[in-house]
Amino acid sequence: MSILTRIFGSRNERVLRKLKKQVVKINKMEPAFEALSDDELKAKTQEFRDRLSGGETLQQILPEAFATVREASKRVLGMRHFDVQLIGGMVLTNRCIAEMRTGEGKTLTATLPCYLIALEGKGVHVVTVNDYLARRDAETNRPLFEFLGMSVGVNIPGLSPEEKREAYAADITYATNSELGFDYLRDNLAHSKEERFQRTLGYALVDEVDSILIDEARTPLIISGQAEKSSELYIAVNKLIPSLIKQEKEDTEEYQGEGDFTLDLKSKQAHLTERGQEKVEDWLIAQGLMPEGDSLYSPSRIVLLHHVMAALRAHTLFEKDVDYIVKDGEIVIVDEHTGRTMAGRRWSDGLHQAIEAKEGVDIKSENQTVASISYQNYFRLYERLAGMTGTADTEAFEFQQIYGLETVVIPTNRPMIRDDRTDVMFENEQYKFNAIIEDIKDCVERQQPVLVGTISVEKSEELSKALDKAGIKHNVLNAKFHQQEAEIVAEAGFPSAVTIATNMAGRGTDIILGGNWKAQAAKLENPTQEQIEALKAEWEKNHEIVMKAGGLHIIGTERHESRRIDNQLRGRSGRQGDPGSSRFYLSLEDGLMRIYLNEGKRNLMRKAFTVAGEAMESKMLAKVIASAQAKVEAFHFDGRKNLLEYDDVANDQRHAIYEQRNYLLDNDDISETINAIRHDVFNGVIDQYIPPQSLEEQWDIKGLEERLSQEFGMELPISNWLEEDNNLHEESLRERIVEIAEKEYKEKEALVGEDAMHHFEKGVMLQTLDELWKEHLASMDYLRQGIHLRGYAQKDPKQEYKKESFRMFTEMLDSLKHHVIMTLTRVRVRTQEEMEEAELARQEMATRINQNNLPVDENSQTTQNSETEDYSDRRIGRNEPCPCGSGKKYKHCHGSRVARQ
């Protein structure tokens, strides 16, 4: 600690000192607000809105607004905000993250900034990690907000468009992070402004902010459409992979391995060795999937390479019951950070299809990206962003670097007395499990509840089997049993209760010591007051037993890659000053040790075990683990930062496209834009054949005539003009062509009317923009996947990506203009009279065909009249005119239909 820090305190301490002065001010107001009637308290909301309209700022009315919410909460919810919750609320009104320990009342704290900022009328979004928490928090706080005249909405998956609009129109909207992101993308795929859901992105308060902005940062939100189906190739390649042999180290000049592939467990990537490439190519040639003499890495075989690498990753890097589960014939992803299943989500780049082939389930079609955005870039769209969590301080640097959010650690209301014991290390997993079971037995005997945290479904099931063998009754909470989550968490605080859980362990819900009597009461049908009192009495008795036993005991079965996830597990115990304890049991076979500790360090630690089953407990161990976790966190931070740098390039382009789309949706008349585009397009085409400031001998007039005819349907005798008029030069010729194009377009507009033409222009522009943007996204994906190869040419891949993507984007915009003008110029406008004539002719044709027993072609139109003839007694020749009167040969008209039938 520096001398300055000792004198002035840390940055966090200085911030808290400043905020405590505001708390004193709010507390002094409490008696005056207690004296207000309900109506007077409710009237404060309109008073604050009027004062904001009059020029006051949110910070000026903050003390009174917080005092209003505190008093309303006492009357409506029966809960009074603690001073530390007021501090948390003030932190959240700024661009800050409040780190509040588990059980400190984050849900109630959130009511303070939400009420204050909702007074502006721009809408407030409270973001949660799942729909259960969104519904729960909204229903908990709804009575308070409605008492104060604020409307509350809930936006979760499965709502109708009307329900969504109603939710977004509310003053305060509770929503899941994924639904907010997808709605943003849907809004930017809408074809009318009425179809959009979201209004201005004003203020987002993100609950469990570390989970959403850190853990989910690498997960892009993608809306996709179906692309081509290639399940046969996935099935074929799937048969190849089991024959490939893993090589432990990559080839070097000194070491030439004999394996077929190497694995990078940190980045979850697989690479073929030269031997592996030859083996794969021989197999593909033998199967007839690749011609002899060709290479897997040739440009024409990129699809095959894509399938092989996806299958290799699926078999070697993604484990069943760790990374995914198989449920109802589908592959369901398991979130590595929370342990929850993510229904509806699919891995990209063919990985999901490769895993479906591996597990023998139905292979669904690959998808083509229609719209995408990362959580990092979505949440940076908000004018104000804040967040709260129990574990943010370890990621404070990243929050500041990426989002510009300062982290403030809020003190607990009561001192934390949990006993965090030192980690113990074992030589292998079996010895570790034996020690864990002994610890659990000890707790059960003393009637202390135990929560055992595992890092995967697979490990939770292994430990469950070991406990069954030991005769210890327990519950398992993992991705396979997530439906029972609320029930299992409610029982986890009972005396002697043993709960095995993955990282999902009731995040967002508290484990109450002695059990949750309210959850028990909810199971009863119309419980009587007598039954409720009995449940309360039973809870008080159990609560006392658990408190004497030492509170909730946490056992970690291995360290997670992130310290934050470990702290979350520990944070389930010791809430609001309750007693509790925690300990992590580790082995040299754990993933963290295996991947991030080199062989030398592991061998050194292995030598420290002299007796079988011996536990190692030392300060050196803590340093080794801290070092390994720091490496992982730095690795993942670099990955997220790298992803953001690439996504920022696409983000700038996304902004430009979505801005253009919103302009189109908000304006019914875009004729000025169309006129400007038409001018640009025709001048661009003319420049290609009549270069500026060139001699007439250099002009390609024939080429220009053909181009104007083919692409724009304009038959212009430019050669004749030049012969007839010697004074016609480059500029005047250009003006004449553009004038004729504009004149012909105006004539079309006069035929159908301005309104109809404006509607058509808007539709063509939107449809073309969406189609080209979709193709551009696919091109950007391909560019991103291969850009790292530029590094071999001593070029910076990021700079190359920026240059290439800018060039592609410019080309897309030019293509957009060209396609729009080409469509609008070539389209043939039909008058009402022509349409009526065509309909009459169609009816006459139908009558003739019915008389001759020929199938009707609804799409053919005719204006010819021909004598009706009875063809029933003779065969119609293939080259004879079709009797329908279309003028086509029979084989090209109804003859082809008859042949098909």
Swiss-Prot record:
The keyword Cell inner membrane applies. It is found in: Cell inner membrane; Cytoplasm. Residues 888-901 have a biased composition (Basic residues). PROSITE patterns: SECA, SECA_MOTOR_DEAD. Keywords: ATP-binding, Cell inner membrane, Cell membrane, Cytoplasm, Membrane, Metal-binding, Nucleotide-binding, Protein transport, Translocase, Translocation, Transport, Zinc. It comes from the Bacteria. Its cofactor is Zn(2+). Zn(2+) binds at residues 882, 884, 893-894. May bind 1 zinc ion per subunit. Residues 848-866 have a biased composition (Polar residues). ATP binds at residues 85, 103-107, 510. Gene3D superfamilies: Helical scaffold and wing domains of SecA, P-loop containing nucleotide triphosphate hydrolases, SecA, preprotein cross-linking domain. One of its GO terms (molecular function) is ATP binding. Residues 847-901 are annotated as: Disordered. The keyword Cell membrane applies. Belongs to the SecA family. Part of the Sec protein translocase complex. Interacts with the SecYEG preprotein conducting channel. Has a central role in coupling the hydrolysis of ATP to the transfer of proteins into and across the cell membrane, serving both as a receptor for the preprotein-SecB complex and as an ATP-driven molecular motor driving the stepwise translocation of polypeptide chains across the membrane. This is Protein translocase subunit SecA.
